[in-house]
Amino acid sequence: MTPKPGHGDASWRGSSGGGSSDPAANTTLAGGSEDPPPRVGTSRAERLDRLRAKGRIAVLVVGGGINGISTFRELALQGIDVVLVERGDFMSGASAAPSRMIHGGLRYLENGEFGLVKESLLERNRLLRNAPHYVSALPTLIPLADRFSGTLSAARRFLGGRPKPGPRGALIVRLGLALYDFYARRERQLPQSRFFGRRATRFNWPDFHPDINYAALYHDAKISRPEQLGLELIADAESACPQALALNHLGLARLDGTIAELTDSLTGERITLTAEVIVNASGAWIDQTNALISGRQTVLIGGTKGSHLVLDSPALLEAIGERMVYFANREGRVCILFAHFGHILAGSTDIRVDTPDGVRCEASEAAYILESIREVFPGIALSEVDILFRFAGVRPLPRADANVNAEISRDHSCEWSTPPGPVPVLNLVGGKWTTFRAFGAQAADTVLARLGTDRTRSSEALAIGGGKGFPQGEAERRDWLRQVAISTGTSEERCAALFERYGTRMLDFMPGADDALLASLPSYSRDEVRWILATGQVATLADLVLRRMTIAFSGELSLDTIHELAALAASPLGWSQAQTQAEIDRLLTHLDHHHGLAATTLVARNSSLPAPLLPSPVGGGSTRSVGVG
């Protein structure tokens, strides 16, 4: 498989983008989707004009998280005139704060959710095939102290009693994995589980606590860039259906009879339209959204907060290698840690919250996660200073009376609001990241039935974004990248970096001859950032830094980089000097409050390049002082 000329659009480069006369600079792959390429470079103003011209549509999806986006795509694939609105940025709520696992849910077997596990494993296997650029295998290790812990608790659950939280022994885990392997057999993509005895466990993992005598190894999967996958689903949906339209920073303000009033959160403009059906996909905010729609706040959601840490710990990274360690702490809470962007992703907590607004990983939660890791790796020193980044999100779980949060179902359901109003409202309750496609398909089928329309196209085997035409196997991948490097005059190293970020979608970009690297972040180039700004529906600096790039998550973000990115974004997004500085200030406040990234930390990460080589901050003054203090 080799790249061939296609239909790319380099208009985003403008007069300063360099560009290339080589047709290979705008290429697609043989074997890709039959859909036309996404509409590249559609500005927010143009999108709003298209929305104003609509008047009446078939379906309005409220909420731009992964489940709302999935429903939007499923409806677009059927040719439905569907609009999706998100009051913040796409993928900015719980969808941006998962454990980065694409998994069947081994723990859910304890709750008897066999159907959910079976569905999750099938969807995991499909994502490995349909989104191989972002979803990859994750060998997972379960450390075990003994053979029989948890046996009585499992028996109590089987007999209808309430189990006592606690550790699981080798026997229970072995039985669970046997069932897990059995359910994963359909469209199998990964190896079956294995067990290690005392000697092998201590030889292979000497950093484990001395009380750990056994280990189980099985395979699940992980996702590297969940936010990007969501954006690709939107682009694919809009390519499949010219009427489909998704807009961020546009929220539902109220429903007046059959007229939905939308508010642009950036300008305050009000836009109205009429929909035959509304899909409430606002996740943890479903009940609040229903209050806007009908004046009655429902009680469908009982969310729990999950917090995670990104740790800079070379010793822990060496101890676990490429495997995830999946373990129960003293309280019986399942915890995880695995390598991610060269660091350690660790989590998580499970705390009930009354409101999803403004959640963050508190100091007590960070301490809890660190202490849980020490239970398994007592010889590896960890402290607050090792935390590079922290994040939290609220799982939109169905309201339940469970005494233990882990017992609340992670399954999903579609529920029509009752009593019905002038416009029928379908609520998407629950759901986990892995099953977004199945949940979206279920929601779309429910809506199609209400509209009296049949499904015409399945997404089960439909490649996503940069997973289209993806080269199979390491040898084919190397050859593919070599061909791209030769045809575009780009170094193989640069091609490999772009491939890791975008998969085959990198061919929509491909750098021009004067693709200058960022002074403060040479892993990115100025043209690459311009392309992201032009094609990624970026409206704020936070959109760019937190959800179109991974530099905050990976510990690469510095104050210099924030200023350099803001300067690049100002012109295409139409920001004045004052607006640009306000964007910087808002981002710094958000990073400090929600992610534990203080301005002093960002200053300490600044480039060691001489000051004259760094871009001047907007508004003048010192790059190292603006926005701090």
Located regions from the model:
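Dinucleotide-binding Rossmann-like beta1-alpha1 core, especially the glycine-rich loop
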Residues: 100-203, 335
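Core beta-strand elements of the Rossmann-like FAD/NAD(P) dinucleotide-binding domain
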Residues: 55-57, 268-277
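Glycine-rich FAD pyrophosphate-binding loop
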Residues: 76-96
